[in-house]
Amino acid sequence: IKAGSPVDSVLGELAPLLEEGDVVIDGGNSQWEDTERRITFCEDQGLLFVGCGVSGGEEGALNGPALMPGGSAGAWELIQPIFEAIAARTRKGAVCVNWIGQGGSGHFVKMVHNGIEYGDMQMICDTYQVMRDGLGMSNVAMSEVFGRWNRGKLDSYLIEITRDILAYEDEEGICPVDYILDAAGQKGTGKW
């Protein structure tokens, strides 16, 4: 369900079918203020509502996401075993989920997470442009730099995939990154 009014429409249809104490979970990229409003709507009907930030992309879909639930008091004890079973785990085995708090806190934390991620992506783009246009570096040389950074304090998924993208050549020895349009779209979740 797309974030925004479609969530409200489905919630309006779903609520009459539920029983007191049931939990509704919004795992989309909803605005935290919308989550606050939906909590009030549900609690007025005896329901619990959880707004849960979900992170992990394709890897998270395959191996478990990082989850950031927040919402109605009392909901966590009901959903905790399920969320812990499906969440990603760290290399040391710690589960990648924790109750963030009441209200729209889960979606608020996801909004902050997205803002940091968008900032990181912009820094990577700016660095790429300086290396390519300012320093005249080749894709292979840039890939090696990102590879070194990924073995240190800057170790991250975004640095890793940037390294891999810059190193990739097709069967004809062409690096597709040289043909990617220098433009980006967005779904609107970064506007808040």
Residues covered by each model-derived region:
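Glycine-rich, N-terminal phosphate-binding loop of Rossmann-like dinucleotide-binding domains
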Residues: 1-2, 28
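Intrinsically disordered, low-complexity terminal tails/loops enriched in metal-binding residues
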Residues: 15
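A conserved active-site cap/scaffold subdomain adjacent to cofactor or substrate pockets
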Residues: 177-192
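Rossmann-fold dinucleotide-binding core
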Residues: 6-12, 25, 31-143, 151-174
